[in-house]
């Protein structure tokens, strides 16, 4: 009897991992994903041979539609969306947006999400209906501020593809970058020309999730990429001149983080 029990337990131990793999299917497996962004997404950027979306393509079979362009800021998202629509229409599953670090570097003012005004509106709360005066928030759509740019982009995407999943990624930590005598970017320890620290822009992307009802993956926190220390610069293109762009190792780490974070999000509805 003991021998049979041991054999049964051994069979169960061998089969459980296989059964769990069969039962758990990644929701982004085999999907078609459009990637909007900047140089970290741009396949032409020389900081790495493989980007995070290349790894996701290998691991999950995702078909990537890549529109990220080096140097771009949030005000370029509508242009990238237009290219996606022209090339694929509605024939894709989700959009991932990974942008914002260049807005910080360009010292784009952070701005506000809304204006407020006193407006007259019909209301009834356990009493007869009446026209009352209340504060009203109105979205600010402008290219002159970071929040206004996000509002413009998200309004366009929400109206154009209301059924699609849209995922925002926060910008990741950044350190020294030398791209020539007219392109020297200090570490995030310094404010930009607008007097703002980098994390203010990260926080605004996180706020956008609640404002626009889209999931945000905080890769600034979860990826572990931290180029400010020499010991961590192993994940970046060049420890001496480029701690802005992850290298292959950094992109792999970023992609692995996304692989697991995306397990909790539907790709299609």
How does the language model describe each region?
Residues 15-16, 50, 115:
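Hydrophobic alpha-helical membrane context
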Residues 1-5:
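Positively charged n-region of N-terminal signal peptides that target proteins for export
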Residues 9-10, 78, 155:
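A periodicity- and composition-biased signal for non-globular, repetitive helical segments
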Residues 20-70, 75-90, 95, 230-232:
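Serine-esterase "nucleophile elbow" of acetyl-processing enzymes
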């Amino acid at each position: 009897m003991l021998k049979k029990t041991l054999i049964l337990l051994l069979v169960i131990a061998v089969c459980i991992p296989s059964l769990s793999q069969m039962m758990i299917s990644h929701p982004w497996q085999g999907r078609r994903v459009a990637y909007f962004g900047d140089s970290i997404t741009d396949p032409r950027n020389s900081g790495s041979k493989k980007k995070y979306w290349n790894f996701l393509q290998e691991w999950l079979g995702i078909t990537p539609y890549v529109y990220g362009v080096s140097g771009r800021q949030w005000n370029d998202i509508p242009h990238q969306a237009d290219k996606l629509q022209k090339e694929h229409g509605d024939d894709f599953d989700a959009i991932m947006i990974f942008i914002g670090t260049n807005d910080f570097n360009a010292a784009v003012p952070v701005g506000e999400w809304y204006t407020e005004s006193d407006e007259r509106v019909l209301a009834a709360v356990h009493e007869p209906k009446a026209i009352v005066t209340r504060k009203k928030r109105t979205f600010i759509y402008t290219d002159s501020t970071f929040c206004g740019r996000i509002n413009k982009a998200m309004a366009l995407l929400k109206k154009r593809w209301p059924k699609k999943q849209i995922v925002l990624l926060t910008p990741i930590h950044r350190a020294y970058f030398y791209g020539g005598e007219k392109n020297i970017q200090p570490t995030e320890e310094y404010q930009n020309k607008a007097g703002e620290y980098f994390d203010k822009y990260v926080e605004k992307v996180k706020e956008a999730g609640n404002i626009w009802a889209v999931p945000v993956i905080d890769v600034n926190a979860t990826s572990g990429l931290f180029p400010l220390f020499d010991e961590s610069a192993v994940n970046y293109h060049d420890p001496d001149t480029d701690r802005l762009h992850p290298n292959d190792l950094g992109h792999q780490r970023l992609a692995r983080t996304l692989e697991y974070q995306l397990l909790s999000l539907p790709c299609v509805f």
